[in-house]
Curated annotation (Swiss-Prot):
<dbReference type="InterPro" id="IPR033704">
    <property type="entry name" value="dUTPase_trimeric"/>
</dbReference>
<feature type="binding site">
    <location>
        <position position="82"/>
    </location>
    <ligand>
        <name>dUMP</name>
    </ligand>
</feature>
<feature type="binding site">
    <location>
        <position position="79"/>
    </location>
    <ligand>
        <name>dUMP</name>
    </ligand>
</feature>
<feature type="binding site">
    <location>
        <position position="139"/>
    </location>
    <ligand>
        <name>dUMP</name>
    </ligand>
</feature>
<dbReference type="GO" id="GO:0004170">
    <property type="term" value="F:dUTP diphosphatase activity"/>
</dbReference>
<keyword id="KW-0378">Hydrolase</keyword>
<dbReference type="InterPro" id="IPR036157">
    <property type="entry name" value="dUTPase-like_sf"/>
</dbReference>
<dbReference type="GO" id="GO:0000287">
    <property type="term" value="F:magnesium ion binding"/>
</dbReference>
<dbReference type="InterPro" id="IPR008181">
    <property type="entry name" value="dUTPase"/>
</dbReference>
<dbReference type="GO" id="GO:0035863">
    <property type="term" value="P:dITP catabolic process"/>
</dbReference>
<comment type="pathway">
    <text>Pyrimidine metabolism; dUMP biosynthesis; dUMP from dCTP (dUTP route): step 2/2.</text>
</comment>
<dbReference type="GO" id="GO:0006226">
    <property type="term" value="P:dUMP biosynthetic process"/>
</dbReference>
<dbReference type="GO" id="GO:0035870">
    <property type="term" value="F:dITP diphosphatase activity"/>
</dbReference>
<protein>
    <recommendedName>
        <fullName>Deoxyuridine 5'-triphosphate nucleotidohydrolase</fullName>
        <ecNumber>3.6.1.23</ecNumber>
    </recommendedName>
</protein>
<keyword id="KW-0460">Magnesium</keyword>
<feature type="binding site">
    <location>
        <position position="134"/>
    </location>
    <ligand>
        <name>dUMP</name>
    </ligand>
</feature>
<comment type="similarity">
    <text>Belongs to the dUTPase family.</text>
</comment>
Length: 144
């Protein structure tokens, strides 16, 4: 086993440990621990009944499942799981469709992606930043 260990606590009999859908999958699927309904044009926090500790030097990013977005208009809200968070992980979902979205216990509702972090960057306040080719262009400015 490598030094990278994702420690998972199942908080009830309904919690399901994250799994990878394929050998090369970037993320681990996260499962709903209960039936839940996200109302049309609404939002909700889906229970998972799991807690986890990510490997040292990483954080867990809760990311959307592309199939939910394309097929049902479901988006995943912001989710950053720090290494020292030990509570239940819940998944924030937004329903952008005109009909209620039903989740069944055991459905995959998001994915967990482990990302490396730089935790020792020094913050230095400066008078100005160096010029770059891009400059202050943002929000699609490079795709002209």
């Amino acid at each position: 086993m490598s030094g990278n260990v994702l420690k998972v606590q199942l908080r009830s009999e309904h919690g399901i440990a994250p799994t990878k859908g394929s050998v090369y999958a970037a993320g681990y699927d996260i499962y709903a621990s209960a039936d839940y309904v996200i109302p049309a044009m609404g939002q909700g926090m889906v229970p998972t009944d799991i807690s986890f500790t990510v490997p040292e030097g990483t954080y867990g990013r809760i990311a959307p499942r592309s199939g939910l977005a394309v097929k049902h208009g479901i988006q995943t809200g912001a989710g950053v799981v720090d290494r020292d968070y030990t509570g239940e992980v819940k998944i924030i979902l937004f329903n952008h469709s005109q009909k209620d979205f039903e989740i069944k216990r055991g459905d995959r509702v998001a994915q967990l992606i482990l990302e490396k972090i730089v935790d020792d960057a020094e913050v230095v306040v400066v008078e100005s930043l160096e010029d770059s080719q891009r400059g202050a262009g943002g929000f699609g400015s490079t795709g002209k």
